[in-house]
Amino acid sequence: MMRIVLFLLTNLAVMLVFGIILSLTGIQGSSVQGLMIMAGLFGFGGAFVSLLMSKWMALRSVGGQVIEQPANEVEHWLVETVRSQAEQVNIAMPQVAIYAAPDINAFATGARRNASLVAVSSGLLDNMSRAEAEAVIAHEISHIANGDMVTMTLLQGIVNTFVIFISRLLAQAVSSFLSGNSDEEESNSSGNPIVYMVASMVLEIVFGILASIITMWFSRYREFHADAGSAKLVGREKMIAALQRLKTSYEPQEEGGMMAFCINGKSKTFSELFMSHPPLDKRIEALRSGQYLNK
C-alpha cells in the first residue's frame, strides 16, 4: 500500500505545482485542443516524475537502508530469497532494503522491472515465519515482474490528463462568470486570474480524489494477481498463511468509521472504493478458489 500512497501523493503534488506555475505565469491553452495537449503533457509528466522518484521517495519516507553487504544471517537470507525469486521470474536483482517499523509490511517500487527495489519492515522479519515472509517477498517480486508500477503510471497519466483538462475548463467558466465577461470575451479570457487559479486548484484536488477511485480499483485488481504470482512462486498455502498472519496481526480495535482504515479491510462501506488493497478475506478466498491463478 505504501508504494501506491507515495506514488499518488507525489503525483498530486507535482500536478499542483505545475498548476500554480501555469496560473502565475499566465500560460494557458488558447483553445480546447491546446488545453488538452497541455493537460496531457503535465498529466503524464506528473505521473512519470512520481515514478522516477519512487525509490528515493520510498526509502526516504521510511528511513530504509539498502543492504549492500549482508551483516547477519537474517539479511543474508533476505537477499538470497529475493535473488532466487528474481531469477525465477527473469528480472534483474532488485535492491533490497530493511526499515525499522513494528508493522508487518513490505513494498516494491522502481521505474523499471530491472531497476527495482524490495523493502521489508523489521516487524515483518520479527513476526512472520520464514515461509510467510517468503510469500510476502514473492508477492512484491510479482508486482515487479508484472510491471505494475509502469502500468499504474500510464493509467495515472490518463486520469491526470482528464482531471487537469476538466478542472481548467470549469475553472475558466467559473472565473469568467464571476468576472462578468461576455461570451466573446469568455472565449479569449479566463476572467480573474486569482479566481481562475483558486478554482482550478480546488477542482483538481476534488476531481483528483474522485479519480483515485479508478486507480484504487486497478491497484486492488493487481493485488489479486500479485497474490497469484506469489502462489505460483512459493506455493498457495504459504501465501494464504501470510495473509492469515496479517489478518490476526491487524485485528482492529477501532469502532465504526475508523475500521475502514485498518489493513484487514473488514468494513464494507463506501470507503472500500478508496482502498488500495482488497480486504484480506477476499484475497484469501481468491487464492483458495484459484480465481486468478490461471490468468
UniProtKB/Swiss-Prot annotation:
InterPro entries xref list: HtpX_protease, Pept_M48_protease_HtpX, Peptidase_M48
Keywords linked to the UniProt accession: Cell inner membrane, Cell membrane, Hydrolase, Membrane, Metal-binding, Metalloprotease, Protease, Stress response, Transmembrane, Transmembrane helix, Zinc
MF-aspect GO terms: metalloendopeptidase activity; zinc ion binding
One biological process term in Gene Ontology: proteolysis
Binding locations of Zn(2+): 139, 143, 223
Membrane topology value: Multi-pass membrane protein
TM region(s), chain numbering: 4-24, 34-54, 147-167, 194-214
Subcellular location: Cell inner membrane
Cysteine disulfide partners in this protein: none
Cofactor(s), by name: Zn(2+)
PANTHER family referenced in this protein's UniProt entry, alphabetically: PROTEASE HTPX
Protein name: Protease HtpX
Native organism: Photorhabdus laumondii subsp. laumondii (strain DSM 15139 / CIP 105565 / TT01) (Photorhabdus luminescens subsp. laumondii)
Lineage, opening ranks: Bacteria, Pseudomonadati, Pseudomonadota, Gammaproteobacteria, Enterobacterales
